[in-house]
């Protein structure tokens, strides 16, 4: 019988907290499941409260554990999202390209982020359900224009067909890693990107 190893190698180098923000029904949970589990469900199930998934990726020789949080976008959950924003390093702002209202809500979500999240948090705008071309009402150029207005990146995705899902999450993680290197004294790093071999509390 072998005894448990006392000095096991670290499973990851850094832990990064990402958030999915947007109106209910835009496909936040579907994007999360596609990225974390490689699965897709066509049934709409409103997220109750808050849930998260984990996926560890490798970037430039470092293992980064992504803790990706998902919550419903309805107004009644806003009290939860105040705590939900705390410690976030990156946020994916999601709208549905077949739903004009969800696109119009993005400005409100950005104001919410500005109120509750860190000033340095990385953001990316996501137009989901790009596979539904016949029902599309929000043109790609409008999404790009809005993203440019706020100085953030933009991608259209399809959780159903796995279009740009990897690119969205990993692209945001790369931006966070770059910011971490460029601003090593950012106090947020000690909260949300914590080397696994230290005993710091994280998020």
From Swiss-Prot:
Record protein name field: Ras-related protein Rab-8B
Membrane topology: Lipid-anchor
Summary of the function given for this chain in its UniProt record: Protein transport. Probably involved in vesicular traffic.
Keywords, sorted A to Z: Cell membrane, GTP-binding, Lipoprotein, Membrane, Nucleotide-binding, Prenylation, Protein transport, Transport
Pfam families referenced in this protein's UniProt entry, alphabetically: Ras (PF00071)
NCBIfam families: small_GTP
Protein's organism: Dictyostelium discoideum
InterPro entries per the UniProt record, alphabetical: P-loop_NTPase (IPR027417), Small_GTP-bd (IPR005225), Small_GTPase (IPR001806), Small_GTPase_Rab (IPR050305)
The keyword Transport appears for this protein: yes
One GO MF term attached to the UniProt entry: GTPase activity
Leader sequence segment: none
